[in-house]
């Protein structure tokens, strides 16, 4: 049996579950790198069925977009730096101040 098959799922309100999934995804992206997360990893970390990730974020690309948006809001430098280094669409909207912080993070 896989880890996902051994996970017990608890029914939650959709907004709470979506936030739980996003929080787990942000944590994983910080630890493993933005490009290295998978739907299965996020499902296991958030104790959610992988189908819920599709329900709330449609695609892995949609989930990654939400991760970067959360990283911008929370100023999570490892995620922003990785996205900026691959010229991700989401970081094009960074404020000059935040972009400067990310560049400083990358150079230290």
Please tell me what each predicted stretch does:
Residues 39, 69-76, 80-83:
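Short, basic, alpha-helical segments at the C-terminal edge of helix-turn-helix-like DNA-binding modules
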Residues 20, 28-66, 70:
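Helix-turn-helix
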Residues 15, 21-24:
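Short helix-coil-helix linker/hinge
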Residues 1-16:
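N-terminal intrinsically disordered/low-complexity leader segments
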Residues 66, 79-108:
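Hydrophobic alpha-helical connector segments
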């Amino acid at each position: 049996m896989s880890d996902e098959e051994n996970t017990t799922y608890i029914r939650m309100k959709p907004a709470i579950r979506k936030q739980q999934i996003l929080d787990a995804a942000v944590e994983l992206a910080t630890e493993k790198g933005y490009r290295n997360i998978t739907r299965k990893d996020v499902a296991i970390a958030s104790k959610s069925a992988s189908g819920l990730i599709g329900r709330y974020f449609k695609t892995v690309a949609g989930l990654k977009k939400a991760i970067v948006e959360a990283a911008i809001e929370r100023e999570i430098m490892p995620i922003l730096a990785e996205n900026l280094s691959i010229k991700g669409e989401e970081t094009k909207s960074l404020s000059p101040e935040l972009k400067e912080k990310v560049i400083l993070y990358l150079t230290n």
